[in-house]
Amino acid sequence: MSDALKELAEYLSEKRSDDVVSTDVNAMGELSVTVAPAQMVGFIEFLKTDRTCRFSTLIDITAVDYPSRDRRFDVVYHFLSMYQNHRVRVRAAIREEDTLPSISGVHPGAGWYEREIYDMFGILFTGHADLRRLLTDYGFRGHPLRKDFPTTGYTEVRYDEELKRVVYEPVSLVQEYRQFDFMSPWEGAQYVLPGDEKADDKAGETA
């Protein structure tokens, strides 16, 4: 299988040399192709229609946040060719201010994934017919899967019985938020476990 994927990687690099930045087949036998963001639609259309590829099934689209990188986000697409029995991972690395072209014209179902990525990461897809939040409320502040999003969020939502509507309020913690130093030994409560008294008795006899 890995030999077949290596041949496919060479084929894609040759046929779409302007699109492909790099290819890799890892130890698990998975093919990854990094594509120039602006060329994403043309490359994915080629994957779908080329007779050697025939990656007609979009499995999913997701994103990964790498805050320390200049190109902060990886947008990752997974495709399946039921004709060739192959899978391929396609990725594009983009900056925070960059946009990606929507592939919903090639794979109509991609629209839902792109909305989710916009909602969770704030990545914009140009040419999307309805790029709205999907999982959070329309007035939600921030994008929850970014690494710089606070674990408490910015606001909390509750239903107000007096106002008879949902209200947004600043986050109010019932206890102080604790930062743990996981590089240091934990200094917590001292618990007495069954059998500890025997160790104490033995230590007393030795003394």
Curated annotation (Swiss-Prot):
Subunit comment for this entry?
NDH-1 is composed of 14 different subunits. Subunits NuoB, C, D, E, F, and G constitute the peripheral sector of the complex.
Q: What is this protein called?
A: NADH-quinone oxidoreductase subunit C
Family assignment from sequence similarity: Belongs to the complex I 30 kDa subunit family.
Where is this protein found? Answer: Cell inner membrane
Provide the E.C. number(s) assigned to this enzyme.
Answer: 7.1.1.-
Asked whether the UniProt record includes Ribosomal protein among its keywords, one would answer no
What keywords sit in the KW lines?
Cell inner membrane, Cell membrane, Membrane, NAD, Quinone, Translocase, Transport, Ubiquinone
Checking SUPFAM superfamilies in the record gives: Nqo5-like (SSF143243)
Q: How does it sit in the membrane?
A: Peripheral membrane protein
Q: Which PANTHER family match?
A: NADH DEHYDROGENASE [UBIQUINONE] IRON-SULFUR PROTEIN 3, MITOCHONDRIAL, NADH DEHYDROGENASE UBIQUINONE IRON-SULFUR PROTEIN 3
Q: What does this protein do?
A: NDH-1 shuttles electrons from NADH, via FMN and iron-sulfur (Fe-S) centers, to quinones in the respiratory chain. The immediate electron acceptor for the enzyme in this species is believed to be ubiquinone. Couples the redox reaction to proton translocation (for every two electrons transferred, four hydrogen ions are translocated across the cytoplasmic membrane), and thus conserves the redox energy in a proton gradient.
Q: A Pfam family matched by this chain, by name?
A: Complex1_30kDa
A Gene Ontology molecular-function term?
A: NADH dehydrogenase (ubiquinone) activity
Q: Which organism is it from?
A: Jannaschia sp. (strain CCS1)
Gene Ontology cellular-component terms listed: plasma membrane
**Catalytic activity as recorded in UniProt:** a quinone + NADH + 5 H(+)(in) = a quinol + NAD(+) + 4 H(+)(out)
- Per the record, the major location class is membrane
Give the InterPro entries listed for this entry.
NADH_DH_suC (IPR010218), NADH_quin_OxRdtase_su_C/D-like (IPR037232), NADH_UbQ_OxRdtase_30kDa_su (IPR001268), NADH_UbQ_OxRdtase_CS (IPR020396)
